[in-house]
């Protein structure tokens, strides 16, 4: 499934989604450089919790320093973007090397999280909250 570039280095690609965020992850063998929207990973993701969420597929498969990642992400907030990056990295690892499939699938990294924001209904204050009710 993995393609190779001009130099013969294996390439993998994966698209991850979470809430309204979309991440396109390009992965190839390298030193472990991670770029998000042409910025360094640490300058883009500053919260430690979000960093661990985003890099959890690499930690789980013991490939943290073995691949270079180039990520394009848009939409949503920082939490949704971290989840989209996690989903995209997991799919890219699976496309690059299928021996990671069992580990990633058993931990739920290849499954898209279907939860989205519920729409506001008319006659209500928010999606489920009603206006204040007075009996008398």
UniProtKB/Swiss-Prot annotation:
Specify whether Ribosomal protein is a keyword of the entry: yes
Q: Which GO terms describe its cellular component?
A: cytosolic small ribosomal subunit
For the biological process aspect of GO, one term held by this record is: translation
Q: What is this protein called?
A: Small ribosomal subunit protein uS9
Asked if the record carries the keyword Ribosomal protein, the reply is yes
Q: Which GO terms describe its molecular function?
A: RNA binding; structural constituent of ribosome
Q: Which Gene3D superfamilies match?
A: 3.30.230.10
Q: What is the lineage of its organism?
A: Bacteria, Pseudomonadati, Spirochaetota, Spirochaetia, Spirochaetales
**Keywords in UniProt for this one?**
Ribonucleoprotein, Ribosomal protein
HAMAP family documented for this protein: Ribosomal_uS9_B
Which family, according to the similarity comment? Belongs to the universal ribosomal protein uS9 family.
Organism listed in the record: Borrelia hermsii (strain HS1 / DAH)
């Amino acid at each position: 499934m993995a393609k190779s570039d001009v130099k013969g280095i294996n390439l993998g690609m994966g698209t991850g989604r979470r809430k309204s965020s979309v991440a396109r992850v390009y992965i190839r063998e390298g030193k472990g450089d991670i770029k998000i929207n042409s910025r360094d990973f640490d300058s883009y993701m500053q919260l430690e919790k979000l960093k661990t969420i985003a890099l959890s597929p690499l930690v789980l498969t013991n490939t943290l320093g073995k691949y270079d990642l180039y990520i394009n992400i848009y939409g949503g907030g920082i939490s949704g973007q971290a989840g989209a990056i996690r989903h995209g990295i997991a799919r890219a690892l699976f496309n690059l090397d299928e021996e990671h499939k069992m580990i990633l699938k058993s931990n739920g990294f290849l499954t898209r999280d279907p939860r989205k924001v519920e729409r506001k209904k008319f006659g209500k204050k928010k999606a489920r909250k009603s206006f204040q009710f007075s009996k008398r």
